[in-house]
Amino acid sequence: MKLPLIDYRQFRLSRLNTPQFRHLKLLLFWPIFSLVFCYLENYRPTVYYAPMRCALDHWIPFCKWFVIPYAFWFLFVGGMLLYTFLYNIPAFRRMMWFIILTYSFALVTYLLFPNCQHLRPTLLGGDLLTRFTAKLYAADTNTNVCPSIHVIGSFAVYFAARDIRRFRANGWRLGFLTMAVLISLSTVFLKQHSVLDVLAGLAVCAAAYPLIYRVPAGAASLIPAGGLGRKRFPEL
């Protein structure tokens, strides 16, 4: 079994700023993101939510089978974060900075442009997938949908896979890309998102990708320690 690059059992708070452990500070983003998102979802004062819809939404049928890739998203993102955290710290840093940049942009968008969707159908039937979708609808509100974090997170994983030597073979790349596309499609076939939300998520990814993964060598001095760019952090 492949051993982790760093023995995290040696971590002490006093060593947080050492080169060995300073990437752990990037994990602080997750509680901050969760708190802000929770506030926007549940505690912000009542505001007008702009409905996101386009003509194409009404041509896309609801398909309960897409709840499978939709739910797999959590394992997809969490699994890649865990893998890079254990076995490829530079890739972990770049993936986290990509997430920090794109997710933060999404939060600012939700704050300044509150949005929602009214595309969910009435669910009929008592089979497992329908019941699971009903639970998903109950747990996840229909607000703060554009840009889609499901789409952004999916392509964060794909870009991270491209960044790791062992996943650069065409078979691996195609597998990760296929899953990212399936998850993105699941958001519209489950009526969790409008096509507009997906397109906005893809646009955010396209804008962020060169900032994280294609930083010019001459700009490396402007990048924060533990921060962005392949030139700054050669692969282990």
Language model features: what each stretch is:
Residues 76-81, 154-160, 178-186:
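Hydrophobic, membrane-inserted alpha-helices
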Residues 2-77, 124-129, 133, 233-236:
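N-terminal transmembrane-helix/juxtamembrane module of multi-pass inner/ER membrane proteins
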Residues 168-181:
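Short hydrophobic alpha-helices at membrane interfaces in multi-pass membrane enzymes
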Residues 121-123, 142-146, 182-210:
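Interfacial helix-loop-helix junctions of multi-pass membrane proteins
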Residues 41-57, 85-171, 212, 219-236:
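Membrane-interface loops
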Residues 67-82, 100, 104, 153:
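Hydrophobic alpha-helical transmembrane segments
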